UniProtKB/Swiss-Prot annotation:
Protein keywords: ATP synthesis, ATP-binding, CF(1), Chloroplast, Hydrogen ion transport, Ion transport, Membrane, Nucleotide-binding, Plastid, Thylakoid, Translocase, Transport
Function, as annotated: Produces ATP from ADP in the presence of a proton gradient across the membrane. The alpha chain is a regulatory subunit.
Protein name: ATP synthase subunit alpha, chloroplastic
Organism: Populus trichocarpa
Chemical reaction(s) catalysed: ATP + H2O + 4 H(+)(in) = ADP + phosphate + 5 H(+)(out)
Membrane-protein topology: Peripheral membrane protein
Subcellular location as annotated: Plastid, Chloroplast thylakoid membrane
Listed GO CC annotations: chloroplast thylakoid membrane; proton-transporting ATP synthase complex; stromule
Binding site for ATP: 170-177
Any single biological process term in GO: response to cold
Residues annotated as site: Required for activity: 363
GO molecular function: ADP binding; ATP binding; mRNA binding; proton-transporting ATP synthase activity, rotational mechanism
NCBIfam families: atpA (TIGR00962), PRK13343.1 (NF009884)
Length: 507
C-alpha cells in the first residue's frame, strides 16, 4: 500500500500556490439578434470599433460596419448558415489583415488570401492590413517610366507610366479583360509583379484567364485574387483591397507592380447590397453616399513612391463596365475623376472588326509623353495628328460626293493607319516593333498597298527586321532613341521587304 506523506503533499500545494497566476480576461461580447442575407444584428459589443473583426460562436468572422445606439450591424465573411439567434459573438480587437510573401506568386487565392487552386497551403511569416493608408503627397514623385502594354494604340497615343492609374472602360464584351491580360503577358522579362483581381465574375471566365497566363508562362510573376459571382458580397467588396495589400508588399520592397481590378462596377454593386441590407440611406442609383470613397481610397494606393521609399511602383488598371456606352453614369464618372486617364473601348469598333476596339478620340492619358521613351515620342506625334484629322474627314466624307485628290489620299492613309493599330489577342509587340510599324504607316510606305495587304506586309516586315536587321532592335533598346542610324536601317528594310512582297503578290 502506498504511503501518503504529509510533507510531500504540503510541498506540492505550496508549489502550486507559487505558480498560480491570477489572470483576468475581459472579453467584449454580444448576442445575435437577427441574421440573414450576409448581415447579422448584434446586441451588446459596447466597446467594438468600426471595421473591427468579430468572431461568432461557430467560427464565422464578420466585420462591424454599423455602430448604432442599440445594436451593431455586422457583415459576414462567409455564408453564416450555422449562426443562430441568441448565440454569442466576441470582438477580436483586430482589423482585417492578410499574410503576405513571395510564395503567393503563381497562385490563385480568395479575398482572405487562402489558396483556391488546390495546390496546398502558402507559407508566410509576415502580414499586412487589408486597408492601409495611401502614400502622402511628399512621399510620391511624378510618373516618368513607361509601363509597356504591348498594344500599339495604347503605347503610342495613350501611354501608361509606372505608378499611374489608367481606367479601362467600355460595354460588356468589348475586350476590356483582353487589354488587361495582354498587358500582363507583356511584362514578361520586365521584372514587374502582376496582381489580377477578379470580382464577381463567372468561375469559368477566371479559369480561362488563369489558363491563358499559365500557357504563356505569365503565372510565374502573377497572383490571381478571385471572388466569383457566387461569393458573399462582403468578400467581393474586400477582394480589391486584398490585391492592393499584396501589390503594396512588393512595391515597398522596391519592386514594380501592376494591379488589375476586373471590375470595379461589381465591387460597387456588392457594396451597395451590403449598405442597403445594413439600412444605410441610399443615394444616386441606390448607391450609398460613400461609394466614391470606396474607390478613391483603393486607387490612391497606386503610386510611384519617392526615392526615399525605394524604387518600387504600383500601377493600377481598374476596369469599369458601362451600359450601352453611357460614361456619364454614377460609377463611371466617379472612377474617371479618380484615375489619371481612361481607355475607352467601343462596341461599334469591336463589331466593325477593329480590335483592340480603342476609341482614340475620347481616350486620354493625363501623364502623357512623360511615360514614353524618346524614340516613341519621335514617331507617335504624327500618328495622333493624322488619325484625328482622318476621323474628322471620314465623318465629312459620308456627305460629300466628289472629294479632291488630297482628301482622298488623306482618307486612304487614315484607313491604313487604322489597320496597323489592329492586333491579335495575346500577341503583344516590343517597343522596337511598335516604332517600326508606326513609322512605316505615317511615312506613307503603306499607301501603295491594298488595305487587305497591310497586316500581312507588316507581319513579314517584323520577321525580316528580327532576322536580318538585328542592330535596329539593339539601337532602340540601348539608346531609347530613334537615331538616324536606326532610321536608315528601317528605311532599307522597308524598301527591301516591299520589293519582295510586291513580287510575291504578283505571282
Amino acid at each position: 500500500m502506498v504511503t501518503i506523506r504529509a510533507d510531500e503533499i504540503s510541498n506540492i500545494i505550496r508549489e502550486r500556490i507559487e505558480q498560480y497566476n491570477r489572470e483576468v480576461k475581459i472579453v467584449n461580447t454580444g448576442t445575435v439578434l437577427q441574421v440573414g442575407d450576409g448581415i447579422a444584428r448584434i446586441y451588446g459589443l459596447d466597446e467594438v470599433m468600426a471595421g473591427e473583426l468579430v468572431e461568432f460562436e461557430e467560427g464565422t468572422i464578420g466585420i462591424a460596419l454599423n455602430l448604432e445606439s442599440n445594436n451593431v450591424g455586422v457583415v459576414l465573411m462567409g455564408d453564416g448558415l450555422m449562426i443562430q439567434e441568441g448565440s454569442s459573438v466576441k470582438a477580436t480587437g483586430k482589423i482585417a489583415q492578410i499574410p503576405v510573401s513571395e510564395a503567393y506568386l503563381g497562385r490563385v487565392i480568395n479575398a482572405l488570401a487562402k489558396p483556391i487552386d488546390g495546390r496546398g497551403a502558402i507559407s508566410s511569416s509576415e502580414s499586412r492590413l487589408i486597408e492601409s493608408p495611401a502614400p502622402g503627397i511628399i512621399s510620391r514623385r511624378s510618373v516618368y517610366e513607361p509601363l509597356q502594354t504591348g498594344l500599339i494604340a495604347i503605347d503610342s497615343m495613350i501611354p501608361i507610366g509606372r505608378g499611374q492609374r489608367e481606367l479601362i472602360i467600355g460595354d460588356r464584351q468589348t475586350g476590356k479583360t483582353a487589354v488587361a491580360t495582354d498587358t500582363i503577358l507583356n511584362q514578361q522579362g520586365q521584372n514587374v509583379i502582376c496582381v489580377y483581381v477578379a470580382i464577381g465574375q463567372k468561375a469559368s471566365s477566371v479559369a480561362q484567364v488563369v489558363n491563358a497566363l499559365q500557357e504563356r508562362g505569365a503565372m510565374e510573376y502573377t497572383i490571381v485574387v478571385a471572388e466569383t459571382a457566387d461569393s458573399p458580397a462582403t468578400l467581393q467588396y474586400l477582394a480589391p483591397y486584398t490585391g492592393a495589400a499584396l501589390a503594396e508588399y512588393f512595391m515597398y520592397r522596391e519592386r514594380h507592380t501592376l494591379i488589375i481590378y476586373d471590375d470595379l462596377s461589381k465591387q460597387a454593386q456588392a457594396y451597395r447590397q451590403m449598405s442597403l441590407l445594413l439600412r444605410r440611406p441610399p443615394g444616386r442609383e441606390a448607391y450609398p453616399g460613400d461609394v466614391f470613397y470606396l474607390h478613391s481610397r483603393l486607387l490612391e494606393r497606386a503610386a510611384k513612391p519617392s526615392s526615399s521609399l525605394g524604387e518600387g511602383s504600383m500601377t493600377a488598371l481598374p476596369i469599369v463596365e458601362t451600359q450601352s456606352g453611357d460614361v456619364s453614369a454614377y460609377i463611371p464618372t466617379n472612377v474617371i475623376s479618380i484615375t489619371d486617364g481612361q481607355i475607352f473601348l467601343s462596341a461599334d469598333l469591336f463589331n466593325a472588326g477593329i480590335r483592340p476596339a480603342i476609341n482614340v478620340g475620347i481616350s486620354v492619358s493625363r501623364v502623357g509623353s512623360a511615360a514614353q521613351i524618346k524614340a516613341m515620342k519621335q514617331v507617335a506625334g504624327k500618328l495622333k495628328l493624322e488619325l484625328a484629322q482622318f476621323a474628322e474627314l471620314e465623318a465629312f466624307a459620308q456627305f460629300a460626293s466628289d472629294l479632291d485628290k488630297a482628301t482622298q489620299n488623306q482618307l486612304a492613309r487614315g484607313q491604313r493607319l487604322r489597320e496597323l493599330l489592329k492586333q491579335s489577342q495575346a500577341a503583344p509587340f516590343t517597343v522596337a516593333e511598335q516604332i517600326m510599324t508606326i513609322y512605316t504607316g505615317t511615312n506613307g510606305y503603306l499607301d501603295s498597298l491594298e488595305i487587305g495587304q497591310v497586316r500581312k506586309f507588316l507581319v513579314e516586315l517584323r520577321t525580316y527586321l528580327k532576322t536580318s536587321k538585328t542592330q535596329f532592335q539593339e539601337i532602340i533598346s540601348s539608346t531609347k532613341t530613334f537615331t538616324e542610324e536606326a532610321e536608315a536601317l528601317l528605311k532599307e528594310a522597308i524598301q527591301e521587304q516591299m520589293e519582295r512582297f510586291l513580287l510575291q503578290e504578283q505571282v
